[in-house]
Amino acid sequence: MIKLILASKSKVRKEILDKNNIISEVEPSNVDEDIIKKSLIKEKASPKAISKNLAELKANKVSKKKNENLVLGADSVIDLNGELISKPKDRKEALEILKKLNGKKHNLISSVCISINGAMVWNYTDTAILTMKDISEEGLKEYLSKISDEALYAYNVYQIEGDGRNLFLHIEGDEDTIMRLPIKKIKEYLNNYK
């Protein structure tokens, strides 16, 4: 059976791999995402390109150390009318992000990349479109009070498979993309890998 190395410390992504019977070990890339995002934004890269570049960079970095192993890098970004929304650093920032998204449509872009020996061999990027309900500030605070710090940072503000679903009026796109790991596409690649 193929073993996959996850270039991330995301417990959520690891759990998804485990639930899908994909043998994996964790080796965080420790890539400084903020510096890379700022550089790519300066170069006028699209949110989709930023997500794809980060996933590839993470996979390539770890795969250079883990020769002959398949390494999975992943990244997700929120695009609000061209503005890149990053993970919150604390609950105050999480509230500000939710207020920004409140009553609006945004794109959630998820990218995955598999690399071997420091070179990408496969990648996939998908976009889901989410329309958030118009919720009072008190309602947003109540939502934030219900989720753990770990969930808050792991899911980039909203935990769609939990109470986060109630924040949205309309969700268009693949559930795997929204969960930030397009697992069906990863399994397709692994099943065809020789």
Where are these regions (language model features)?
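N-terminal polybasic phosphate/anion-binding patch
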Residues: 1-70, 84, 138, 142-145, ...
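Structural motif
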Residues: 3, 69-70, 106-107, 111, ...
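Amphipathic, non-transmembrane alpha-helical scaffold segments
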Residues: 51-52, 98, 176-179
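Generic enzyme active-site microenvironment
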Residues: 73
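Active-site-adjacent loop/tail segments of enzyme domains
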Residues: 76-106, 132
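Short beta-strand-to-turn element immediately C-terminal to the catalytic PLP-Schiff-base lysine
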Residues: 79, 113-115, 169-170
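Anionic-ligand binding region
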Residues: 111-123, 127
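Active-site oxyanion/phosphate-handling segment shared across diverse enzymes
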Residues: 123-194
